[in-house]
Amino acid sequence: MVAEDAPVRGTCRVLFRTTTLIFLCTLLALSISILYESLIIQKQIMSQAGSTGSNFRLGSITDLLNNILSVANQIIYNSAVALPLQLDTLESTLLTAIKSLQTSDKLEQNCSWGAALINDNRYINGINQFYFSIAEGRNLTLGPLLNIPSFIPTATTPEGCTRIPSFSLTKTHWCYTHNVILNGCQDHVSSNQFVSMGIIEPTSAGFPSFRTLKTLYLSDGVNRKSCSISTVPGGCMMYCFVSTQPERDDYLSTAPPEQRIIIMYYNDTIVERIINPPGVLDVWATLNPGTGSGVYYLGWVLFPTYGGVIKDTSLWNNQANKYFIPQMVAALCSQNQATQVQNAKSSYYSSWFGNRMIQSGILACPLQQDLTNECLILPFSNDQVLMGAEGRLYMYGDSVYYYQRSNSWWPMTMLYKVTITFTNGQPSAISAQNVPTQQVPRPGTGDCSATNRCPGFCLKGVYADAWLLTNPSSTSTFGSEATFTGSYLNAATQRINPTMYIANNTQIISSQQFGSSGQEAAYGHTTCFRDTGSVMVYCIYIIELSSSLLGQFQIVPFIRQVTLS
């Protein structure tokens, strides 16, 4: 219930503050008008009866204006400071009370203790925020690894494989999923899906642990792939596609694979729907979830998506000649401007994938059970983002951000602030603003290695999202200084040396490599949160690590504290 009200509360704040600004502008106009009239009256009185009476009347008018301005200042303080603090306090109090009611009382005689799907109140108000100022971001370090029980199961045979994790966290709870392959790591033949939900609780040592309250194992013969998960009020929503052919064959097809939405509630209710978003058939050859988590926003669940667009369709023609070159490239690439533009334009089209245009976007679904034709596809404009790739959506306060995997020629971490336009209560368009950075590189081969800085066609890279620790909007120029954390593979061409880091736009500030040199790894997901009791910031780094004992990969959650030095 609280998660549903949070976006509405944010909208009400905006409306209230807008009304307040209009009221203040009206007061200012009236004040200027009164002052102007008083000056005219003063001149008339001075010319007729001297200055004594006029000074008295002017003083009365000045007192009146001071009273008006005093009221206006109080309104500004209440709307900008007092009211938001009161709302946050009330929300925290309500969530804490709900958790207390559901965990401290037995339902009836001899019943077991209840278990509410609500994080411990130490963390409720420390989730999905920017945690440090711009100045503090320059002095952050990674703490040591903290020993917690893993909430992620591993393969139990040498032939098995667990891959493609997706993790989502909100004020109330977390959701997690990964793919389970019984033999090898190729997911296009047969695989199952593990899903869990739970809460964050403190340990006796003071740091957090992740308690699993519900699990689900989807093993019904349906080959769900690349699933992206999002927390929703009371449970989890998951977006998957179904395919039993290699990725290249998906792109060479003329009809997109089956798209599915699965809603799992804490009360064991499960709803699964095959969705048919308008504008997909005959436009997209394939449409894939971004694997990274989605977000719940203004009554809609948003998921990252990408795929191949068919030539000469309306979407293809609308994106023609559009391209995006990150801001940092100008000082780092030796190509002339014309060559950069030409290569950047061609980077969105892949001959390997049947000359499809590789496009990123957002799948938006209302939170309801009848989803067959209700979900919408919102493509990004290609003059704002790079070639389509896996991705993740974040909520920082009321703002939506997007991570795009660096599959294309620019090997650095790609983060964007997203603006979503609503028309008649539905999301109708999206735009993206890039956070400029020349860190942190991903590995690739040939001309697409971690050292590449110039536009060209690439289809490389690895998923390695990052968490913003400072607000890019806090600087006079958006994103001119931003600090973020994550994990990356510290090598130019190979998927080896998993390393957790803190970085800003131009340099890595702090880093810790896991394992010995040459340790193989793959995908990495990072999420941070704050313990509002101790004011400590913790980050969970979920990394796919190669294993010589059980399966080709094991998915391991690492927790570290981010400290201000």
Curated annotation (Swiss-Prot):
Residues 42-565 are virion surface. The chain crosses the membrane at residues 21-41. The C-terminus (head domain) is involved in binding the cellular receptor. Gene3D superfamilies: 1.20.5.110, 2.120.10.10. It is found in: Virion membrane; Host cell membrane. It is a single-pass type II membrane protein. The lineage of its organism: Viruses, Riboviria, Orthornavirae, Negarnaviricota, Haploviricotina. Belongs to the paramyxoviruses hemagglutinin-neuraminidase family. GO terms for biological process: symbiont entry into host cell; virion attachment to host cell. Keywords: Disulfide bond, Glycoprotein, Hemagglutinin, Host cell membrane, Host membrane, Host-virus interaction, Hydrolase, Membrane, Signal-anchor, Transmembrane, Transmembrane helix, Viral attachment to host cell, Viral envelope protein, Virion, Virus entry into host cell. It catalyses: Hydrolysis of alpha-(2->3)-, alpha-(2->6)-, alpha-(2->8)- glycosidic linkages of terminal sialic acid residues in oligosaccharides, glycoproteins, glycolipids, colominic acid and synthetic substrates. This is Hemagglutinin-neuraminidase. InterPro entries: Hemagglutn-neuramid (IPR016285), Hemagglutn/HN (IPR000665), Sialidase_sf (IPR036278). The keyword tRNA-binding does not apply. GO terms for molecular function: exo-alpha-sialidase activity; host cell surface receptor binding. Attaches the virus to sialic acid-containing cell receptors and thereby initiating infection. Binding of HN protein to the receptor induces a conformational change that allows the F protein to trigger virion/cell membranes fusion. Neuraminidase activity ensures the efficient spread of the virus by dissociating the mature virions from the neuraminic acid containing glycoproteins. Residues 1-20 are intravirion. The keyword Acyltransferase does not apply. Glycans are attached at residues 110, 139, 267, 504. Disulfide bonds join 161-185, 175-236, 227-240, 333-454, 365-375, 448-458, 528-539. Residues 223-228 are annotated as: Involved in neuraminidase activity. Homotetramer; composed of disulfide-linked homodimers. Interacts with F protein trimer. The gene is HN.
